[in-house]
Amino acid sequence: GKGAHLFTRTYANGLALLAILTAYPDEATAKAKIISGGPFNGWSYYELIVEALDLIKWYQGDGDKRGSWFYGITQTASRYDGSTQQWPTMVIKAAEDRWGIVSPQWVIDNAVHAMQNRLSSPGGGIGYSSGSSSVDVGKTGGGLVTYSLAKMPLNDPVMANALSYAGANWFSATPRKEGGPGWVSNLYAMFAIKKGLDLADVETVTTSEGERDWQRDLSSWLLGRAENLPASFGSSKRSPAYSFGQNADGTWEDTWVFIARGGKNIRAAVGVGIMARGLTDFPPKPII
């Protein structure tokens, strides 16, 4: 097909496509639901995702930009960018897990090449334009998404190195805005590492404080539950201004990507996404 997109920017397009993929549990349901109105009038949601995946494949970089994705989605990627890589691979992984749509192996191989050979630091963390540029836990979560898409086992040296980096920097209270690798006050980083650890199917990370339930730590920060966190961790940032606890209207503040993009509604959605158990597959709900 000619491809389709919901937004022209990689972040927003990925979030919107993930919402569709998680709204319908399987291929049959997605094929049965027909869009009424707008540019995709008469299409099924399944057709829309297939076309969106075609575009994702098309704008992946080639040659010396092999496997890259950049901010805009209507032209081939012009450089490597560790912050954008995770959104296309997240959609590809969700399409496979939810609806059984398997993308060509070359797309996945190229994505791994970008993360492993162009963006990874020796310590396993993922950087911005290279493995020595703005390496942090958030972008490393994006690396874990890509490695999980490629079905790397946990004992693969590449996967193990990335997990080790995440654990070693788990309790850094210095986020990217302040030049550090941590996730505190950074909803983008929190959602990114949540995606990566969830898809890697690990329940704990090995940190300076021992084994930690990463989901509990992230959720505790967002809910303002100080009793669940080490006393010294981010002690100067324990206020709603740093995403520690919700605002009165149930939303969160942010200090990075979502401070100026999307408004409070997207911050609320991302906050809930961070705390939700699962990303492409969700635990069964008990019947009470």
Region spans (language model):
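An alpha-helical repeat/solenoid feature that recognizes helix-turn-helix modules
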Residues: 1-54, 58-109, 116-283
